Amino acid sequence: MFIPQSYTLAIILCFITMICWGSWGNTQKLTGKSWRFELFYWDYVFGILLFSILLGFTMGSSGNSGRGFIQDIKQAEGHNILHAMIGGVIFNASNILLVAAMAIAGMAVAFPVGVGIALALGVIINYVYTPHGNPTLLFGGVAMVVLAIIIDAAAYKKHSLSLKKVSGKGITLSISAGILMALFYRFVASSMVTSFEVPEPGKLTPYSAIFFFAVGVFISNLLFNWLIMKQPFEGNPLTFKDYAKGTFDIHLNGVLGGVIWNIGMSMSIIASGKAGFAISYGLGQGATLIAALWGVFIWKEFKGATKSVNTLIFLMFVAYLAGLALLVYAGA
């Protein structure tokens, strides 16, 4: 299987994660406001599973290091498979809440609040279980990210009040998503080998861990998304007849969103061997910065903002960049 051989390459993979995790939400935007997020999500989850299989039979089956994809699945112990799948279930619950928040409050709010909380809590959780890197720089980076979250929330509140359009539900969903999202990565990490080059028996290598994680997402979605269709956060209940009305392009957008997200997840897990779980997860969740850039500059979610709101948005970007820089240096 493919294994990165240097910290520099691992950091590059983490930045790919950041771009992917911060950009997949655009695929939901491209489906249009008439295509509800519950319908988008079926295709999105299929894209996640599809890419995990493709990755396993390509990068997971090439090279001479570690264990091959199929060989690794055959030798995996049940409790490790279960841990990776539980990670998928927790992620799916958190991501449904995040996508709902994004539909209600927009990318520029849902990502900084939801994913920002996930970054701060997730880095702490992963560092406690697997210490790696300079803790002063690591937690200094987390503190800067938390500051960016607070600034973004203040900007959103100020802008919403000026438009007389405050979505408490969007903020609540974002916070709930962030708390859950902080937990999923640890379950996947606990199922994995400590050495990619010389993997322990019974444990999962990155590629099989990603596959079983995706299976957990797929299976749980059959229940979670069905329930959300019956009892939506906003709007009328949906049926599978509504899903069947989607065009090929609309369904393709959803699948593409899942593929883009799982490219990010895969690069993060693969990078963790050299960067450590706390740093690979934390840098990946810098996706918030990318999503906020999309939301502010492409989708114009803060269009018509006052000068004070624009100043807050600028300060949010500065705080995020400072936090990400500290996370990179923490593992150097």
Regions found by a protein language model. Name each.
Residues 1-332:
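Polytopic alpha-helical membrane proteins, predominantly small-molecule transporters/carriers
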